[in-house]
Amino acid sequence: MQLNKIKLHSCTTFASAQSQITLDDDYNVPDYRPDIVKVLKEKGELHFDEVKAAAGAAWLKGRLVFRVLYRSDQENGKISCLKGEIPFQEKLNMDGVQEYDVIQASGEIEDLTIGVIHSRKISVRAVILLKTEEPQEKEDELCVGIEADDGCEKRYRNTNILQLLCMKRDQCRQKSEITLPSSKPNVQEILWKSLEIRNLDTKMGQDGVKLSGEVLISVLYQEEEETDRVQWYETVIPLDCGVECDAGTEADIIYKVKARPASMELEVKPDYDGEERVLVLELVMNLDIRVWKEQEISMLEDVYSLKKEIIPVCTGVTLHHISVKNESQCRLTEQMELAESQEKILQICSCEGTVHLESTELTEQGVRAEGILVTELLYITTDDQMPIGSAREIYPFEQLIEIPQQTARTERNKPEELEALERKNKLQTELDCRISQLSAVMLDQDHVEIKAVIGLDLLAFEQEQIDNITDMREEALDMEQLQKRPGLVGYIAKDGDSLWSIAKENHTTVEDILRDNHRTDEDLRRGEKILIVKKVELNSYES
């Protein structure tokens, strides 16, 4: 028999791995930099130079680039900075991966500690979590009918499928120039820079994927005057960039765009008068784009014939259904108190933050997320001998992102029924978090109020395992066994019975049972009595 099939495109993770590594190294202060007295701030970035697949493994080669802001022992230019890097290479075992496979790598700096060994040497210690995965686009064929059925009895089921329209990785770039206001002096050297994205939003439209939001730029620099004083400048510029995506022209699409900075560089260049007053921002964003569309289809679930024996050949297929796409916000208001040993605050320069998602748990109401917000302050002190100070604090947060279908299912089903349902239909969740807003307000010289809004984007899929007909075997009827069956049967319905299963078992059709019992509906209740008349096609004897 020739089957009618449609193609189902989906994305899956073929293999994944993660590994925690520790980098520990000493770094000598360059000769052109003054001696170190105290480390004020440190920052690290991961750069992957090579990601290579091998048989059953992935090789990562990259660098930890670190920056340090510190106090020096000089009378003029008390604040200085340095930049260095530590290379690393790591092998992650990934079952099933072959050479030339495309591997995606990401990393997270879980801890970065930089200490002073002596005035010309520092120790750098970092704990890094490396992750690799191999995403693949999968294609299945779903059976939706038979071309020439020859009078077969067929049962269909209506279902929604999630059709993958696009899966791609891309980059978008933005270059902006900012001229210092006239009240600010020229730049001799940038000592510290903070570049953070706020209120990030992604939209899918006719022109593709558009990113919007804000880039918060904070710069600590040394002015060109003879005093070598330190200046601070802060501004916000709009983020507006995007990439093309053909799937954006489809109607009723569902999309997920994961955007994260690949690199953010800030340099200074001369203006038209030759003065160092123009800041140049070059921003590169990595985009992980997936686009789906829900489609309602009628799948062929079962088939039999009164003329011959038909044996469907089935294989298991996983269907995905969108359960919820939810954007939630967690608001934090905390108070930071400086230690007694720290310098008092005169003015806050910048407030930087990073958010880490530590655990997610699927509950009866939705997904419970727990994580931490790491907040770092850079401020001007009341002590002219030590003009710049810093403070750091960690705040935990917890948020419940509701899944409406999950709540309704809990209220509708008994616990044992819910457990059975969850075994059959598993919920797959993807949760991303980011800082939407972060601010620091000085209360007094020792206390700062921290306010933050953490964005949590949840995409939940309901997974359903089904049997999909891939082929059919045809055999002649066993007429001897068929003749031994009674021609007339009285049947009392049991739990789980359906007219389809009864008709197939007793060699008749659902329509004949309805007609013989003067019924119009196919719903059976336990204890109902029905009359079954065996039906034998003449062609069966002739064959």
Q: Where would I find each of the regions flagged by the language model?
A:
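Interfacial loop/beta elements and low-complexity acidic/Ser/Thr-rich segments
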Residues: M1-K484
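Extracellular LysM carbohydrate-binding repeats and other cell-envelope/extracellular binding modules
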Residues: T508-S543
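Intrinsically disordered, low-complexity Ser/Thr-rich linker and spacer segments
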Residues: E475-L488, K534-S543
